[in-house]
């Protein structure tokens, strides 16, 4: 029974499959037939559309060709018209050019005729001029060249006279303007440079706490005062002046050393030859410090920098030098300021002018030790310490020993004269007195064996320290006579001069 059911099911399935196959086949064949029909219809429609588009494209192409043809014809027509217009303009220009050429030819012919007429006229004038010249030569008895030379000479003389008058007029006006400008510059510089320094004295007054100190200064039998004067070379004057003693000497350095030493001795109270010698040595060292500080202060005050240290030290020594009673350092600072002010007015190098002004008298710092004028000494010093040629030239020319070649040299010369000529700055008699004392010491220093010499008592006495190992007692007698004889022959002086030779021998031993 189950087998039959299974068989029926299988047969039913097979029949279903066969029926389904045929049904599917019929459906597929129907779809194929429908698709073929649709494809055919689409092809037919496409052929119809393609034919229409082809005809439409042909029509559009024909229209485009026609349009392009019309544009080309219009452009060709426009260009033809433009060419015709240009041809007409060219023809007009050719006609105008032809007319101008004709006119030029006519003018050229006219100019040729006029040129020929001018040549003829020139030839006639030349003939007339030659005849007149010949007649003038016959009448005057001179050739044309001689007459021309006479005329040129007359003209030259007249021109030379006129030029001389003009040159003199210009020179006078230039001198007047230069003098006025120079006066204005110098007046301005003097007004702006206020200097209150006047001539220095050759004495220093030392106050005392009481008159009893005078006896201590003199010492037993005058040994203290003799030791002091011998060591310092300065006169110590003790008179009736209450509570004061006077130091007198022409050398400011010695006078300053003596002043410092005496003030310290008075303050210390212990006054005897050994103490005096100790204080004098300390005072000398202090003066050296003062010299250096004075040089540095001078460069700071004037604004002149970059100087060699030795030049700065020499500037400081000028503080203790005088020229006709005028302090040389203050004079140099004044010249520096004046030269700088005048240089500023003229618009030239102010620093160079001030540097030359400050160093112009540097030779006076060592003129006691070195022979020769202070100008030459200053030039040598500045060359040694590598100063510029302009500064060296200004120093060499400031007293007229050399012709000034630069404006700065002229300004230093003028500033030096202004400072020296200022009322109260110098005293001629004092300078001659100091020079006589210096000469007195120089004469003593020329002899061999002399260690140092001091002119004291206003030049009426000179004390000479000799080297004991070179000068014995007999040689000292001969030496003092020789020095006195040389002073008589070479020096003019009033009255008489006392020459003293001091020969001192020291033997030192320490007790241990």
From Swiss-Prot:
Molecular functions per Gene Ontology: RNA binding; RNA endonuclease activity
GO biological process: mRNA catabolic process
Broad class of enzyme this protein falls into: hydrolase
Domain KH: 202-265
Keyword Cell membrane annotated: yes
Coiled-coil region: none
Membrane topology label: Single-pass membrane protein
EC number: 3.1.-.-
Protein's cellular compartments: Cell membrane
InterPro entries the record matches: HD/PDEase_dom, HD_domain, HDIG_dom, KH_dom, KH_dom_type_1, KH_dom_type_1_sf, Ribonuclease_Y, RNase_Y_N
A GO CC term assigned to this protein in UniProt: plasma membrane
Domain HD: 328-421
Residues passing through the membrane, by range: 3-23
One Pfam family hit: HD
SUPFAM superfamilies: Eukaryotic type KH-domain (KH-domain type I), HD-domain/PDEase-like
Keyword annotations: Cell membrane, Endonuclease, Hydrolase, Membrane, Nuclease, RNA-binding, Transmembrane, Transmembrane helix
Domain of life according to the entry: Bacteria
Principal location class: membrane
Presence of keyword Transmembrane: yes
Similarity comment text for this entry: Belongs to the RNase Y family.
Biological role stated in the UniProt entry: Endoribonuclease that initiates mRNA decay.
The protein's name: Ribonuclease Y
Organism of derivation: Desulforamulus reducens (strain ATCC BAA-1160 / DSM 100696 / MI-1) (Desulfotomaculum reducens)
Gene: rny
């Amino acid at each position: 029974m189950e087998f039959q059911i299974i068989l029926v099911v299988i047969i039913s399935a097979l029949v279903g499959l066969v029926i389904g196959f045929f049904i599917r086949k019929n459906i597929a064949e129907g779809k194929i037939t429908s698709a073929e029909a649709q494809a055919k219809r689409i092809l037919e429609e496409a052929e119809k559309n393609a034919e229409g588009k082809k005809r439409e494209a042909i029509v559009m192409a024909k229209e485009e060709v026609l349009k392009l043809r019309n544009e080309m014809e219009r452009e060709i027509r426009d260009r033809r018209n433009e060419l015709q217009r240009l041809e007409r303009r060219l023809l007009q220009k050719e006609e105008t050019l032809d007319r101008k050429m004709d006119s030029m030819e006519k003018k050229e012919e006219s100019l040729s005729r006029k040129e020929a007429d001018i040549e003829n006229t020139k030839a006639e004038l030349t003939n007339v001029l030659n005849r007149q010249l010949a007649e003038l030569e016959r009448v005057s008895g001179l050739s044309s060249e001689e007459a021309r030379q006479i005329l040129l000479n007359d003209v030259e003389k007249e021109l030379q006279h006129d030029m001389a008058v003009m040159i003199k007029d210009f020179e006078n006006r230039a001198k007047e303007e230069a003098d006025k400008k120079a006066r204005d510059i110098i007046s301005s510089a003097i007004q702006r440079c206020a200097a209150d320094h006047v001539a220095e004295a050759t004495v220093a007054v030392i106050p005392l706490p009481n008159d009893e100190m005078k006896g201590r200064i003199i010492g037993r039998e005058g040994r203290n005062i003799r030791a002091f004067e011998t060591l310092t070379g300065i006169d110590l004057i003790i008179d009736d002046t209450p509570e004061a003693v006077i130091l007198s000497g022409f050398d400011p350095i010695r006078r300053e050393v003596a002043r410092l030493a005496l003030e310290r001795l008075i303050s210390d109270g212990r006054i005897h030859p050994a103490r005096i010698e100790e204080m004098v040595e300390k005072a000398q060292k202090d003066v050296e410090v003062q010299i250096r500080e004075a040089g540095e202060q001078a460069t700071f005050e004037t604004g002149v920098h970059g100087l060699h240290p030795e030049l700065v030290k020499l500037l400081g020594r000028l503080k203790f030098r005088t020229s006709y009673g005028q302090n040389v350092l203050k004079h140099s600072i004044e010249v520096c300021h004046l030269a700088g002010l005048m240089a500023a007015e003229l618009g030239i190098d102010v620093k160079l002018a001030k540097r030359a002004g400050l160093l112009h008298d540097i030779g006076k710092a060592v003129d006691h030790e070195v022979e020769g004028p202070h100008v030459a000494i200053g030039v040598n010093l500045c060359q040694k310490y590598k100063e510029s040629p302009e500064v060296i030239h200004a120093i060499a020319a400031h007293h007229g020993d050399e012709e000034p070649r630069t404006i700065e040299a002229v300004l230093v010369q003028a500033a030096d004269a202004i400072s020296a000529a200022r009322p109260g700055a110098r005293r001629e008699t004092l300078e001659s007195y100091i020079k006589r004392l210096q000469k007195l010491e120089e004469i003593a220093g020329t002899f061999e064996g002399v260690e140092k010499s001091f002119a004291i008592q206003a030049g009426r006495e000179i004390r000479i320290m000799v080297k004991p190992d070179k000068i014995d007692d007999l040689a000292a007698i001969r030496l003092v006579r020789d020095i006195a004889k040389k002073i008589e022959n070479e020096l003019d002086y009033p009255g008489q001069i006392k020459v003293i030779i001091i020969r001192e021998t020291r033997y030192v031993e320490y007790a241990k």
